From Swiss-Prot:
Feature: compositional bias, Polar residues: 14-35, 396-405
Comp. bias regions, Low complexity: 47-199, 379-389
Organism: Saccharomyces cerevisiae (strain YJM789)
Region (Disordered) location: 1-35, 47-200, 374-405
UniProt induction comment: Induced by pheromone. Down-regulated by RIM101 and inositol.
Lineage: Eukaryota, Fungi, Dikarya, Ascomycota, Saccharomycotina
Protein name per UniProt: Pheromone-regulated protein PRM7
Length: 622
């Protein structure tokens, strides 16, 4: 009635029409079915395997005439990505050992192919976009590590070639017009963006990369140029660790030069020397322009200098020169001092500075009763912020008591921000022709000043508004560590008796002045000052707790002057029994504000309060 088949039985089907033999074997153990098709006419063997578990379909064809093995796989769960609709095909020619792969993106109809020839170590990649008929090809020569790419646009007959040399990190790009055989390195439009990066370290390597992009508003052609507009030099003296690097970009706004000097320890200089030095400068300049004639120029400069090891870097300084984008005036920044100590580490000055200039010119049109009124509007804003931190290392404090060890570390932080927002609105459009424009100066107290000349017949300025904000913050953080081998405590207690007291004092001064001038009316304020003390102690004593609170406030007011001062002191000491970590904290906060007013009355008020709570055992060692 029934016939039992083996698990690996092979079924053969012969098609007399095509003279092809089809063999199928099913292995239920692995849930895979293998189908083999032999065409005696072309002697081509086609083998297909279907894995029911992963729904994978793998087809392999072998042509004995050319010995070409082509394999394609389509896995609906992994290989076929419906999100990107990308098909990947790879073929290997064993005769020439050339690997060629092509991918088709069905969403954008972009066909790209790449081939690798191991004989010449050249990788060729070609992509065709049928939408725009743009053919782009790139080749990489592995022997010389030079990467070059080119794109051809048949519409404009323009060939764009870009090459990168990793050895010198030089990026060169030039568009070529075959019709006129003209090679253009720059665009007729001013530079829209520029990035300059300089990095150097102690092993004698220095890298300079620059990228400049130009946009032609007429043809909307984006052209980029690299080191063609850069004159750079960087050198490092390993013996003295002197790093000097300069860069000049004549077509852009910034000319920057940096020199870093640092002494090395006496003795022979070896590769295992712990003293390392690195200097990284990142300078970015960007300019944007729109049809409304709005221009924004911003630049940021970040200096990061680090030094580690046992070297005595007693001489360390940074000299920076910067060119103002508006006036092209060279300004030299002050030298940032560092700690001059004989300890195992040195001060690490960190400085950052950013400048933003913005100007907007336009004409506003208002219509009323079929009458159009044109009003020119000219406004500008400037913002400059800088921050400098000087970290001094732990400085041991000598003491005759062998049971006491103390160290002090100081951190100074300077933060400064200036902003200016002047604007002028004139009711007469003819006055715009006689204006001298805005003049920006990075060294003046107000980064942007107004210098305008109006004809006597058109002196009809309706409103002048100028607002300047100047904020400077100076923070000094002093950390003191005192280790005491205390003999105070329970004599029957055999635990640790070491006591560590850490005190952090933060002195913060934040004078922030804001002045607004509108129709010959001005206001100005403020000044803030605060001191914070944090004390922490670790000890192995009995339970000790205490709280100290002191409040003090005073306010005095007079004509054209207002002064308020507030001081708050809070001390809390907590020590638990048989504990290694016992924390005590304290804080002192004081603030002062000064305001200038037109009218006022005298008022003086002072409030003082002192509260002290202590447990049975006071802290005798504090």
């Amino acid at each position: 009635m029934y016939r039992t088949r083996s698990s690996d039985e092979v079924a053969t089907l012969t098609d007399p029409t095509s003279s092809s033999d089809v063999a199928t074997s099913a292995d239920p153990t692995s849930s895979s079915a293998v189908t083999t098709l032999v065409d005696p006419t072309t002697s081509v063997v086609i083998s297909t395997s279907v894995d029911q578990t992963s729904s994978s379909d793998v087809a392999t064809s072998v042509d004995p005439t050319t010995s070409v093995i082509s394999s394609t796989s389509a896995d609906p769960t992994t290989s076929a990505d419906s999100t990107t609709s990308t098909v990947q095909t790879t073929s290997v020619d064993p005769t020439s050992s050339v690997v060629s792969s092509s991918s088709a993106d069905l969403s954008s109809s972009v066909i790209s192919s790449s081939s690798a020839d191991p004989t010449t170590s050249t990788v060729q990649t070609t992509s065709v976009d049928p939408t725009s008929s743009v053919v782009s090809s790139s080749s990489a020569d592995l022997s010389s590590s030079v990467i070059s790419s080119s794109s051809a646009d048949p519409t404009t007959s323009t060939v764009q070639t870009t090459s990168v040399d990793p050895t010198s990190s030089v990026v060169s790009s030039a568009p070529v017009d075959p019709a006129s055989s003209v090679v253009s390195l720059t665009s007729s439009y001013p530079t829209s963006s520029s990035t300059v990066t300089i990095s150097a370290n102690s092993n004698g390597s220095a890298t300079l990369t620059a990228q400049t992009t130009s946009i032609d508003p007429v043809s909307s052609i984006v052209s980029s140029s690299g080191a063609t507009t850069i004159i750079s030099s960087a050198s490092i003296d390993p013996a003295s660790s002197v790093v000097s690097s300069t860069s000049s970009e004549p077509t852009s706004f910034i000319v920057s030069s940096t020199s870093v000097y640092s002494t090395r320890p006496s003795g022979p200089t070896t590769s295992t020397d712990l003293a390392t030095f690195s200097d990284t400068i990142i300078l970015r300049v960007s300019t944007t322009s729109t049809s409304q004639d709005t221009q924004t120029v911003s630049s940021s400069l970040t200096d990061m200098v680090s030094s580690t090891g046992s070297a005595d870097l007693s001489v360390s300084s940074i000299q920076r020169s910067q060119v103002d984008p508006s006036t092209f005036a060279v300004s030299n920044s002050p030298v940032y001092p560092t700690a001059s100590t004989g300890s195992t580490s040195t001060g690490i000055p960190i400085a950052s500075e950013s400048l933003s200039l913005s100007r907007q010119q336009g004409i506003s049109a208002t219509s009323s009763s079929s009458i159009v009124t044109l009003t020119p509007v000219d406004s500008a804003s400037s913002s400059r912020s800088s921050a400098t931190s000087i970290i001094k290392p732990n400085m041991p404090v000598s003491s005759n008591d062998s049971k006491t060890q103390s160290s002090v570390s100081v951190v100074d932080t300077f933060q400064s921000t200036k902003s200016s927002y002047p604007s002028i609105t004139s009711a007469d459009p003819t006055t715009l022709a006689s204006e001298n424009g805005l003049v920006g100066s990075s060294s003046s107290a107000h980064p942007i000043t107004l210098d305008r000349t109006y004809a006597s017949a058109h002196a009809s300025v309706t409103d002048i508004v100028s607002r300047v904000t100047d904020s400077t913050r100076h923070t000094t953080l002093v950390t003191s560590n005192i280790n005491i081998q205390s003999e105070v405590g329970n004599l029957n207690y055999s635990g640790p008796k070491d006591t560590t007291i850490t005190k952090q004092s933060a002195f913060m001064t934040s004078p922030a002045s804001t002045s607004t001038i509108s129709n010959v009316q001005s206001t100005a304020s403020v000044m803030n000052h605060s001191i914070e003390d944090n004390i922490s102690a670790t000890a192995s004593l009995e339970s000790v707790s205490g709280t100290s609170t002191k409040d003090y406030s005073s306010q005095s007011s007079a004509i054209h002057y207002t002064n308020s001062f507030t001081t708050t002191t809070t001390n809390a000491f907590i020590t638990s029994k048989h504990s290694i970590a016992a924390v005590s904290t304290g804080a002192i906060t004081s603030s002062a504000s000064i305001s200038l007013i037109m009218e006022g009355s005298a008022n003086i008020e002072a409030v003082g309060k002192l509260v002290w709570l202590a447990a049975a055992l006071p802290l005798a060692f504090i």
